[in-house]
Amino acid sequence: MNGPVRTEPLHGEIPLLASSGSYSVVVLLRGYAEPQGAGDAVRADGTVTLVLPRGWASDSSRGLAPSADGGSKTALEEAVRGPILVDTGGPWARGALLEALATQGVAPEDVTLVVGTHGHSDHIGNLGLFPEAALLVSHDFCLPEGLYLPHGLCETQPLILGSGLQVWATPGHGGQRDVSVVVEGTSLGTVVVAGDVFERLGDEDSWQALSEDPVAQQRSRERILSVADVVVPGHGAPFRVVRETVKSSEDLICEGKAVA
């Protein structure tokens, strides 16, 4: 059975690629947060992650249109047939974002869905580059030209985007409406793109000071760590989650070991 959880560095260069039968996860730009000077000033930008459907080809996903019945399910199915961008970084990183997308063969007009994990400028500062994409920013889901649709996302009800692809409500850092993207079955296991639920590997001594709701964020962190094999944090390198195995008394008896 599962025991304590620990985290450790995930070695690899950016862009990090984790592929699966349905989607590939590519960390395009690694976020950072660097103290500046003697005061509390920080230079920061958020991590940007690309989720590519298997078999996607440029030009195949353009022309996203509202669903005929106005329902969010059909609209979401349409939105995930092309490249999905999770956060966009700040506007000061516009050039770096465009270059990173081009490296993956993706133009801004190819992107069919942008997920903003929360409403801070270093995470959604380039939304204007993607006017043809559907937007899921925090809990607001809208189609191009501003048609907003309901969807029912909450902590107890994830938003299913596709097979092995979900959006979770993970409140805390920016308030009650933060989200994370969960991609199952990749070559690295389950990858959770967590926004600032996790600032970076080893942030245990600092995340509370940046949180709007530390109690809710602690709950979100524990929930993510219970399923993730890899976490993509908001301001650092992706890291691995390792679950220690604790043997049950039945296992120990089978091995011939005494149980007190």
From Swiss-Prot:
Broad enzyme group: hydrolase
UniProt keyword annotation of Cytoplasm present: yes
Compartment(s) where it occurs, according to its Swiss-Prot or TrEMBL record: Cytoplasm, Cytosol; Nucleus
GO cellular component: a single term: cytosol
Entry binding sites for Zn(2+) 1: H118, H120, H173, D196
E.C. designation(s): 3.1.27.-
Cofactor notes: Binds 2 Zn(2+) ions per subunit.
SMART domains on file: Lactamase_B (SM00849)
Substrates-to-products reaction catalysed: a ribonucleotidyl-ribonucleotide-RNA + H2O = a 3'-end ribonucleotide-RNA + a 5'-end 5'-phospho-ribonucleoside-RNA + H(+)
Protein name: Metallo-beta-lactamase domain-containing protein 1
Species name: Mus musculus (Mouse)
